[in-house]
From Swiss-Prot:
It is found in: Cytoplasm. The gene is hemL. Transmembrane segments: none annotated. GO terms for molecular function: glutamate-1-semialdehyde 2,1-aminomutase activity; pyridoxal phosphate binding; transaminase activity. The lineage of its organism: Bacteria, Pseudomonadati, Pseudomonadota, Betaproteobacteria, Nitrosomonadales. Keywords: Cytoplasm, Isomerase, Porphyrin biosynthesis, Pyridoxal phosphate. Its main location: cytoplasm. This is Glutamate-1-semialdehyde 2,1-aminomutase. Homodimer.
Amino acid sequence: MSRNEALFEASQKVIPGGVNSPVRAFRSVGGTPVFFSRARGSRVWDADGREYIDYVGSWGPAILGHAHPGTVKAVQDAAANGLSFGAPSEAELTIATRITELLPSVEKVRLVSSGTEATMSAIRLARGFTGRSKFIKFEGCYHGHADFLLVKAGSGALTFGNPTSAGVPPEVAAQTIVLDYNDVAGLERTFAEIGDEIACIIVEPFAGNMNLVKPSAEFMAAMRRLCDEHGALLIFDEVMTGFRVDLGCAQKLLGIRPDLTTLGKVIGGGMPVGAFGGRADVMDALAPVGPVYQAGTLSGNPVAVAAGLATLASVSEPGFYPALAARTEKLVKGLTAAAREAGVTFCADSVGGMFGLYFAAEPPASFAEVMRCDKEKFNRFFHAMLDHGVYLAPSAFEAGFVSAAHSDADIDATVAAAREVFRTL
């Protein structure tokens, strides 16, 4: 029995399913999950000492690569001054100011400790500000595990082939309107029927939890227009895309200004963190100045804030994002060419440092199209690449990530491995 297998067997006795987040269990792809012992740069090492080129990057935060020296030093320095205050700090002001400088749509911002906290707080705020209860989300999009968001969820929920969750009361789910991603006609019909009951739309501007799915310009424009016409708020869930695709996030690339934005992952540099912000008049509805309550013991944690500030400083360097996008495009083009040579139906797409791999002729534009991709072929591809020392997301429903630490040699080695694997599929 390998060390990975022994750890998984032991973990299942004391941790539900042996993991602390469902997608890590490899239920989608089969087999034993990999237990990591350390990570540095573009590489991770498992409990058996095997080394992998990592394209998961802790599900997005590791944009600089693992254990980046500047981030590690910032964490060490902050920790030496106290792990948590439970009180305001100057560092909170510094990171909040930096976020508002980088995102014109964010006039005020509040820090929390996770992406789920950010999205559920943003929706509560939208409901409180508008006085309405219903909100729109899109099938396959994942916005955390709050009850009212686990309706046609993406990410790990899709891994089980069951896009909802037990334990979500029907009366809670009834307030969640689920539409198809990129379906402009469906949006217009819904607003025509109940527009005055809708508090907000929440959307992943580039969906990354049903693999990478890009929005059409018409879809983006329709959401902004319909929210304006009916007094609803538009929330961009940029927990994944925030500072991952551009220094101005997805909203800059798409040219759409949301009313509220949720952030996480990159702004914590690998530490647990989240944030939500937007229009000042909306944000001022939050306690202690407004009637919408939100709180958190570890919100604005000084160690997480230090890691975030160090990361934002690095990604703000001139040329960072063009270089990251070029590296990601090189990977995508190399994999596509390797599949073509082998006669495998496959395509790939990317935006910034995010990418999607699809065993289909064209990149999907909706959840339904994602579900038509060849999942079994992906599973075989995943395990074969793992055997070749390449760690991809263990699910056909997840985007992948390239970091600044990935070298041309890493990309070349990955494409070479894929070339061998595609020939066996």
